[in-house]
């Protein structure tokens, strides 16, 4: 595969160990009334898009076809995606393209910090594609971005949503601990039974260890994780994952509804009602999470500033 080849949908997942059942995927469940998304058409939305293009920046909002993009861009917030727009993994729920990435752009931290300063953002989320091709998984680039943002916008709070750094965990955590964020986020995404199907190349135990080891190295930094419902999990399995997260000292939690980006992606197996999401939120509170955001349209970085504020991060 040549660099910059963008594979999506069935082209991306063709080599996965567990194939998508296209016949089942074609039998789409009807979206319930509580799944509603605003069209992205505000002036602020266009302003944010223009600034991103001028500075050659990517957002996970666009690359992953997030349903909340109109609202978030309209509020002048975005989750910036560093290290390019090509992922080395092939997760069938995700709309980010797979391919052989280019080398990291050494000017990206500067461009990112400049854009954040121009937008006068008080809270930013920085995420990335998986970069299994890099010796540190991209951790140094995360640290460089954090450092550049703090230099230009010292008042801005920074949350990072990191990949799993599988096979590179020790060196990655060393680099991140030297320049830590205000919130450390790594999403488990789903239950361990579905990992081979939904997160090929990832490992449930390893992801928990990442969160635990970061907390051990930086105990004052809140840790956070997120889950999607509708991939084939049971309620009991979700509660088990919540218990595992608390056992690994994770402070904050998000749970949202999985929405299928295209017919070539993993099908939606169920739609969870707002009432059931509220039940998960109550369980999370009882388990001791400092903050839990659970709802159909909740995403890991959706209203992340409000989540952090409610968890006591100023």
Curated annotation (Swiss-Prot):
<feature type="binding site">
    <location>
        <position position="94"/>
    </location>
    <ligand>
        <name>[4Fe-4S] cluster 2</name>
    </ligand>
</feature>
<feature type="binding site">
    <location>
        <position position="91"/>
    </location>
    <ligand>
        <name>[4Fe-4S] cluster 2</name>
    </ligand>
</feature>
<feature type="binding site">
    <location>
        <position position="301"/>
    </location>
    <ligand>
        <name>[4Fe-4S] cluster 1</name>
    </ligand>
</feature>
<feature type="domain" description="Radical SAM core">
    <location>
        <begin position="73"/>
        <end position="290"/>
    </location>
</feature>
<dbReference type="InterPro" id="IPR003698">
    <property type="entry name" value="Lipoyl_synth"/>
</dbReference>
<dbReference type="GO" id="GO:0016992">
    <property type="term" value="F:lipoate synthase activity"/>
</dbReference>
<comment type="similarity">
    <text>Belongs to the radical SAM superfamily. Lipoyl synthase family.</text>
</comment>
<protein>
    <recommendedName>
        <fullName>Lipoyl synthase</fullName>
        <ecNumber>2.8.1.8</ecNumber>
    </recommendedName>
</protein>
<keyword id="KW-0963">Cytoplasm</keyword>
<dbReference type="GO" id="GO:0051539">
    <property type="term" value="F:4 iron, 4 sulfur cluster binding"/>
</dbReference>
<keyword id="KW-0949">S-adenosyl-L-methionine</keyword>
<keyword id="KW-0004">4Fe-4S</keyword>
<dbReference type="InterPro" id="IPR013785">
    <property type="entry name" value="Aldolase_TIM"/>
</dbReference>
<keyword id="KW-0479">Metal-binding</keyword>
<feature type="binding site">
    <location>
        <position position="66"/>
    </location>
    <ligand>
        <name>[4Fe-4S] cluster 1</name>
    </ligand>
</feature>
<feature type="binding site">
    <location>
        <position position="87"/>
    </location>
    <ligand>
        <name>[4Fe-4S] cluster 2</name>
    </ligand>
</feature>
<dbReference type="InterPro" id="IPR007197">
    <property type="entry name" value="rSAM"/>
</dbReference>
<dbReference type="GO" id="GO:0005737">
    <property type="term" value="C:cytoplasm"/>
</dbReference>
<dbReference type="Pfam" id="PF16881">
    <property type="entry name" value="LIAS_N"/>
</dbReference>
<dbReference type="InterPro" id="IPR006638">
    <property type="entry name" value="Elp3/MiaA/NifB-like_rSAM"/>
</dbReference>
<keyword id="KW-0408">Iron</keyword>
<dbReference type="Pfam" id="PF04055">
    <property type="entry name" value="Radical_SAM"/>
</dbReference>
<keyword id="KW-0411">Iron-sulfur</keyword>
<feature type="binding site">
    <location>
        <position position="61"/>
    </location>
    <ligand>
        <name>[4Fe-4S] cluster 1</name>
    </ligand>
</feature>
<dbReference type="GO" id="GO:0046872">
    <property type="term" value="F:metal ion binding"/>
</dbReference>
<dbReference type="InterPro" id="IPR031691">
    <property type="entry name" value="LIAS_N"/>
</dbReference>
<feature type="binding site">
    <location>
        <position position="72"/>
    </location>
    <ligand>
        <name>[4Fe-4S] cluster 1</name>
    </ligand>
</feature>
<comment type="pathway">
    <text>Protein modification; protein lipoylation via endogenous pathway; protein N(6)-(lipoyl)lysine from octanoyl-[acyl-carrier-protein]: step 2/2.</text>
</comment>
<keyword id="KW-0808">Transferase</keyword>
